[in-house]
Amino acid sequence: MYIEIIDIYAREVLDSRGNPTVEVEVMLEDGSVGRAIVPSGASTGKFEALELRDKDSKRYGGKGVLKAIENVNEKIAPKLLGLNAYEQVSIDKTLLEIDGTENKSNIGANAILGVSMAVSRAVANSLQLPLYKYLGGVNAKVLPVPLMNVINGGAHADNNLDIQEFMIVPAGAPSFREALRYGAETFHALKRILKEAGHVTAVGDEGGFAPNLQNNEEAIQVLIRAIEKAGYVPGKDIYIALDVAASEFYNGETGKYFIDGTEKTSDELIEYYESLINKYPIISIEDPFDQEDWDSYRKFNEKVGKKVQIVGDDLYVTNVKRLEKGIELKATNSILIKLNQIGSVTETLNAIELAKTNNMTNVISHRSGETEDTFIADLAVATNAGQIKTGSLSRSERIAKYNQLLRIEEELGDAAEYKGIKAFYSIDR
C-alpha cells in the first residue's frame, strides 16, 4: 500500500492555559488531511524530550513556539514530502534522524510529535477508519477505566496540598458510559461538600477543585464522603488513586521529602504511604518518589506492589531505555504513557508494548496544558491499555476525551469491553 504525503503545514495555536502550542496538518495525495495539536506539561520530568520554546520575552512571556513551527515547515516538510504515509515507523525514524539528538532538542519534541500524530490521523482518514482502529487493528476494543483528577494540589494548584492529584476511579462500573456517570455524580457531590464547608470551588488546570485542607489525608477523607454522598461504595464501586509527583517536594541535598509540614526520609515516606493504603481504598499511586530515587521505588514495589498499582511517570517519561531499567530493578508495576514526553507515535507504542510484555499496566495520560485534540482517547482503545488519565469532570479540553470514548464505545457496540478492576492486572484484586 502506498499513499504520498503532499503537504505538511504547522501553525501556532493556544492550549488550555492560554500558552502557545504546535498544530500540524498533513495532507495526502487523495486529499485526506490529518490535524494534531500537541499538549504541554506543568510538572515535567527532567528526562523528558525537549519542548522547544522561543524564549522571546516580547511574545507570550517567552513561551512562543515559532521556532518549532519553522522547523516543521522548513526542516521537516521538505524531507517528508513524497514519502509513503502508511509507513509510520519509517516516518518517525526519519523525524528522529532529522533531529539527531537523544532528547529531540534540535527541532523540538513538539515539532516532531505534531507531525507524527498528524500523519497517523491523515492515514486513518484516508482509509476511512476510526483512528483507534487504524492504530490498533481489529482487536482494539477495550474502553479504559478513567482515573479522574477531582482534587488538585502540588504544582497544579495554589493551595497547601503536597500531593498533586487526588483521583476517583470508577472501576466497579459495568461500562465506560456508567463509569463516566459514577465519576460525574461524585464530582458534583464533592462540589457540594466543599461549598458547604466554605471552600472555594473554582477549578484548576485539570478541572479539579483546589481547596485548602488541613493535610493530604483530609483530601482523601473528603473524596470518600463525596463517593458515599453520590450513592456509591468506596472500594467497591469507586476507588481512590493518587499522583504524588514527589520530585516536586524532594530535596536533592538532604535526600528527604517535605510533606505535610515535615521532612521525611524515603523509609518514613514508605510508612506514610502504607498507613494510607491500609486505611483507604487506594488502588494506584503515581510517582511516590523522586525521579532518580530508584531504590525507594524498588523497596516500595516489593512491599505493596501486589496490592497497589505503582505508576512511574517522571521516573520513565515514556522512554524505553528508562523503562528497561525499571523492569530490571522491579521498580514499579505500571507506567504512565504521555505522547509528548517521548515525542513520537512509534516510540510511544514501543513503550506500551514493552510494559505489557512485562506484565506492567499502561495508563494513557493527558498533560495539564491540554487542547481539544482527542488523540489519547483513541490511543487508549487502540492499545487496549485499560486505563486513562484525562482530568476531572469539567473543562472542555478534558471532557473532549471522555466524549470521544463514549462515541467509540457506542461504535464498538457489543464488542466493547470495560475491564473495570481487571484493568489493574499487575496487582492481586
From Swiss-Prot:
Which cofactor names does the annotation list? Answer: Mg(2+)
Entry's SUPFAM superfamilies?
Enolase C-terminal domain-like, Enolase N-terminal domain-like
- UniProt keyword list: Cytoplasm, Glycolysis, Lyase, Magnesium, Metal-binding, Secreted
List the GO biological process terms. Answer: glycolytic process
Q: Does the keyword Disulfide bond apply?
A: no
Under the heading SMART domains, the entry gives: Enolase_C, Enolase_N
Q: Where, per UniProt, does this protein localize?
A: Cytoplasm; Secreted; Cell surface
The molecular function GO annotations come to: magnesium ion binding; phosphopyruvate hydratase activity
The source's domain of life comes to Bacteria
- Free-text comment on the cofactor: Binds a second Mg(2+) ion via substrate during catalysis.
Indicate which residues the UniProt annotation says bind (2R)-2-phosphoglycerate.
Q164, K338, R367, S368, K389
Enzyme nomenclature, EC number: 4.2.1.11
Q: Name one GO cellular component term.
A: phosphopyruvate hydratase complex
The chemistry this enzyme catalyses reads:
(2R)-2-phosphoglycerate = phosphoenolpyruvate + H2O
The role this protein plays is:
Catalyzes the reversible conversion of 2-phosphoglycerate (2-PG) into phosphoenolpyruvate (PEP). It is essential for the degradation of carbohydrates via glycolysis.
- Protein family (similarity comment): Belongs to the enolase family.
Query: Entry's NCBIfam families?
Result: eno (TIGR01060)
Q: What is this protein called?
A: Enolase
Organism, as annotated: Thermosipho melanesiensis (strain DSM 12029 / CIP 104789 / BI429)
